[in-house]
Swiss-Prot record:
The keyword Zinc-finger does not apply. Its EC number is 6.1.1.15. InterPro entries: aa-tRNA-synt_IIb, aa-tRNA-synth_II, aa-tRNA-synth_II/BPL/LPL, Anticodon-bd, Anticodon-bd_dom_sf, Pro-tRNA-ligase_IIa, Pro-tRNA-synth_IIa_bac-type, Pro-tRNA-Synthase_IIa_type1. Signal peptide: none annotated. Pfam families: HGTP_anticodon (PF03129), tRNA-synt_2b (PF00587), tRNA_edit (PF04073). This is Proline--tRNA ligase. It catalyses: tRNA(Pro) + L-proline + ATP = L-prolyl-tRNA(Pro) + AMP + diphosphate. The keyword Nucleotide-binding applies. GO terms for biological process: prolyl-tRNA aminoacylation. GO terms for molecular function: aminoacyl-tRNA deacylase activity; ATP binding; proline-tRNA ligase activity. Keywords: Aminoacyl-tRNA synthetase, ATP-binding, Cytoplasm, Ligase, Nucleotide-binding, Protein biosynthesis. SUPFAM superfamilies: Class II aaRS ABD-related, Class II aaRS and biotin synthetases, YbaK/ProRS associated domain. Consists of three domains: the N-terminal catalytic domain, the editing domain and the C-terminal anticodon-binding domain.
């Protein structure tokens, strides 16, 4: 492609509202243009990147045996009412009404539509398993669209759905999709991790997320460098300490803490380790009879509550944090001084595993401006009603697989696979006849990739002060030819054209910058848009039969023979 025939729309500065590096750079590089809040046009340069991602996704899905189809973006209300999601999906769903006053939505996802297809078309076990996918624009009415394509209202997604006669068959396809996703991200040249994840609102059983690693990632991940263990922090198990609880050595005593309402402040006042303090978190849950139950969740002072884990404790599936009024009612003191000692039988105490082995610890006294020191289970308060893993793991915790220690990093979720089982097929009565002629509900899997989100995530992972550093598989062009004095030197023009033709004939994506711009402007643009390889041609070098070659990730250029440049580029690619 000749730059004079292309549309390059680079900018020196990014709009002030752009926060993430990817958002700033995509706007500056002219990959996207903002139309409205969370709405972006993919410009020719950006669309080349997006299409390359789509191609790799499509190739790997086809290789895995999935069948591509395309479903309507607009979906009728009636389908969503069958699963109950019309009422519960929330304001993220864009609801529309046609001229006949019939309600529809602009699809945020397609479980209902594909299940409707399955129940209409699949009759026998002989037709299963089947695995469908589509690459399509989705819409979710984000309350605060931000971060460019990372959290846009309109986005491109690959969503896939599989149907099976058994859990074993579902597991086989699930494993195949796991490998296909790994292949996709490896081919894209991204550093990523697949982690066990919570199934969330979509529901079901098994679930894995695929995260591109980036310091700006919204999600915290736990992994072990010495094994394959990796999980979202929401699910990473914090093992119980191996050491037993120590014997009491200190007497129980009250300590004045007039202004200290946090574990950090109390530890600083008393000159003790934060690990010797216990924080008490008051929550309220509703039991099966509809009655409110008050709980104290006990955590070590240096640990943080994991709400996903806590919700899995019996009785806490729908807990909420207690109000100040409720705390005063049950414990008789304001927040900041609450603790488990001396509480009534109406207060249910749940201790994290790390708290259960503590002795001589410090906690709130349930009296204003007072804490207790030298607290011990069995002597000063009963053993906890429940001991469970309710905290986030921290750096250095033992890995749950016993093969080393946990490390933490940040990630951007770009893919998610679920074992939905019969959640949707039961709701929509999607059945088949088994070998005995009996009706059975189909088992179902769900597999999503944020295609447009991948572009933003790749830029978050690869950028510097000069601009974007695209992986080779995603770059809009593989090679840029930068001729100096193009509009003034026939020798430069001739060499540039010859090299352009030779590389293009080899099937290499080449951008020939024939705009006649000054070298500084030309180099800045080519670095900004992230082309992996640059060849500079000038009169001075041509006299010696040489050109300059520089990889986007290299600190400086190197002088090479013009006769060797094609083989150098081919080897680099």
């Amino acid at each position: 492609m000749r730059a004079s025939q292309f549309f390059l729309a680079t900018q020196k500065e990014a709009p002030q509202e752009a926060e993430l590096a990817s958002h700033k750079l995509m706007l500056r590089a002219g990959l996207i243009k903002r139309l409205g809040s969370g709405l972006y046009s993919w410009m020719p340069l950006g669309l080349r990147v997006l299409r390359k991602v789509e191609t790799i996704v499509r190739e790997e899905m086809n290789r895995a045996g999935a069948l591509e189809l395309l479903m309507p973006a607009v979906q009728p209300k009636e389908l969503w009412e069958e699963t109950g999601r019309w009422a519960v999906f929330g304001p993220q769903m864009l609801k529309i009404r046609d001229r006949h006053e019939r309600d529809f939505c602009f699809g945020p996802t397609h479980e209902e539509v594909i299940t409707d297809i399955a129940r209409r078309e699949i009759r026998s076990y002989k037709q299963l398993p089947l695995n469908f996918y589509q690459i399509q624009t989705k819409f979710r009415d984000e309350i605060r669209p931000r971060f460019g394509v990372m959290r846009a209202r309109e986005f491109v997604m690959k969503d896939g759905y599989s149907f099976h006669t058994s859990l074993e068959s579902l597991q086989q396809t699930y494993d195949t999709m796991y490998q296909a996703y790994s292949n996709i991200f490896n081919r894209l040249g991204l550093k990523f991790r697949a982690v066990r994840a919570d199934t969330g609102a979509i529901g079901g059983d098994g679930s894995h997320e695929f995260h591109v690693l980036a310091d700006s990632g919204e999600d915290a991940l736990a992994y072990c460098e010495h094994s394959d263990f990796a999980a979202n922090v929401e699910l990473a198990e914090a093992l119980a300490p191996e050491h037993p609880r120590g014997e009491p050595k200190e007497p129980l005593r009250e300590v004045d803490t007039p202004k200290q309402t946090t574990c950090e402040d109390v530890a600083a006042l008393l000159g003790i380790s934060l690990q010797q303090t216990v924080k008490s978190i008051a929550v309220v849950a509703t039991d099966e009879a509809g009655n409110s139950q008050f709980y104290l969740l006990l955590l070590r002072g240096d640990h943080a509550l994991n709400e996903v884990k806590a919700a899995k404790v019996p009785g806490l599936s729908s807990f909420r944090f207690a109000s100040e009024l409720e705390i005063r009612e049950y414990l008789g003191c304001p927040p900041g001084f609450i603790g488990p000692v001396g509480v009534s039988t109406q207060v249910n105490v749940v201790a994290d595993r790390s708290v259960a082995v503590m002795s001589d610890f410090v906690c709130g006294a349930n009296k204003p401006k007072l804490h207790l020191a030298g607290v011990n289970f069995g002597r000063d308060l009963p053993e906890p009603m429940i001991v469970a893993d309710i905290r986030n793991v921290v750096e250095g915790d033992p890995s749950p697989d016993g093969k080393g220690c946990i490390s933490l990093c940040r990630g951007i979720e770009v893919g998610h696979i679920f074992q939905l089982r019969t959640k949707y097929t039961e709701a929509m009565e999607a059945t088949y006849l088994d070998e005995n002629g009996q009706k059975q509900f189909m088992e179902m899997g769900c597999y999503g990739i944020g295609v447009s989100r991948i572009v933003g995530a790749a830029i978050e992972q690869g950028n510097d002060e000069r601009g974007i550093i695209f992986p080779a598989a995603m770059a809009p062009f593989s090679v840029a030819i930068a001729p100096i004095g193009y509009d003034k030197s026939e020798a430069v023009q001739s060499a540039a054209h010859a090299l352009y033709d030779e590389l293009s004939a080899l099937g290499i994506d080449v951008l020939l910058d024939d705009r006649g711009e000054r070298p500084g402007v030309m180099f800045a643009d080519l670095e900004l848009i992230g082309i992996p390889h640059r060849i500079v041609i000038g009169d001075r070098g041509l006299k010696e039969g040489q050109v300059e070659y520089q990889a986007r990730t290299a600190a400086s250029a190197e002088t090479v023979a013009l006769a060797d440049i094609v083989s150098i580029v081919r080897q680099a690619l």
